[in-house]
Amino acid sequence: MKNSMLQAAWDFVGIPFRLVLFDQKWLPYFGWTTLEEARCCAVRSYLKGRVLDIGAGTNSLINQYDNGVGVDIHEWGGGALVVEDTSRLPFADESFDTVTLIACLNHIPYRQAVLREARRLLRPSGRLIITMINPLLGNVGHAIWWYGEDKHRGGMKEGETGGMWSSEVLSLCRETGFRLRRHRRFVYGMNHLYVFEVSHKQ
């Protein structure tokens, strides 16, 4: 993705197509940045060491970063490890320096269990990175995104939500052993990026 003023201007012109009307697979043909690219770009500068990407989808982040592994419960291509349960992963304790959940925590019904698993897998100096959209935008988006991944797997399942409020994300992470270090917005303020560190409080 070209990170330039010209690219940013072209992406802005294309907002209706990029964010609503067009399948994300079409955007590169028009020179527009996909949501997946924007999310990966927002996350990349916070990655360190060996990375585990939970809910990796097409495994774009790991294929770009090239030091880690992506896992998902669905096969989307790209080389991610397909698992039955992302709260019980086949890795030893403290195997990773960074765990990411990019635009997917709201799609995991057993969120607390997955965050506890992330805590188990992180080294003491590790960090957890989450991106999220709020439920109002998310519910509208999932209703109109005819190309959304949930449509390809039969729709939203019980326990999934269109998005999560910041208060929910922060509360869940605090309860599972994380402390917030950074929170910022991206993609015109509609997406949230949270960077947590492992909390060592007993």
How should these model regions be labeled?
Residues M1-S87:
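Conserved N-terminal segment of class I S-adenosyl-L-methionine
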Residues R88-D93:
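Short conserved loop adjoining the S-adenosyl-L-methionine
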Residues T100:
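A conserved beta-strand element that flanks and buttresses the S-adenosyl-L-methionine
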Residues A103-H107:
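Short catalytic micro-motifs in class I SAM-dependent methyltransferases
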Residues Q112-P124:
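A short glycine-rich, Lys/Arg-flanked "PGG" loop and its adjoining helix->strand segment in the class I
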Residues I129-K151:
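Conserved class I S-adenosyl-L-methionine
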Residues W146, D150-S167, R185:
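Acceptor-substrate binding/catalytic loop of class I
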Residues T176-G177, R182-Q202:
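Core SAM-dependent methyltransferase catalytic element
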